Design a protein with these regions (language model features):
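Metalloprotease/metallohydrolase-associated module, dominated by Zn2+-dependent proteases
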Residues: 1-49, 65-101
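Active-site recognition of the HExxH zinc-binding catalytic motif
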Residues: 52-64
Length: 101
């Protein structure tokens, strides 16, 4: 996958993998590594949960790729919001653009 001319990988790893362990020791379902340009996902993710976790991690990949640095709590808020509502926003925009004028 390419974001802003930067190649990124998506890798599925086992639950509890070191790649899914945060700096505070907690384990997560997805992790984005800006150094290796890799999104790591728990290989047990399926369906809607996979969709939401991948959308969340893509936000982090876009932030890294466009060299955007904001407070981590705000970045997490944006990533969560987009994982929940981003697709609705884009579909609405597409529909509006097709029907304007």
């Amino acid at each position: 996958m390419i974001i802003n001319n930067i190649d990124w990988l998506i890798m599925f790893v086992q639950s509890g993998s070191p790649f899914l362990t945060r700096s505070d020791g907690s384990v997560t379902l997805g992790m984005t590594d800006g150094r290796t340009k890799t999104i790591y996902l728990d290989d047990n993710l399926r369906g809607l949960m996979l969709d939401r976790v991948l959308a969340h991690e893509l936000v982090h990949a876009f932030m890294f790729s466009y060299d955007i640095h904001i407070d981590i709590e705000f970045e997490e808020y944006i990533a969560d919001w987009i994982s929940l509502f981003g697709r609705d926003l884009v579909y609405l925009l597409d529909n509006l653009m097709q029907n304007l004028r």
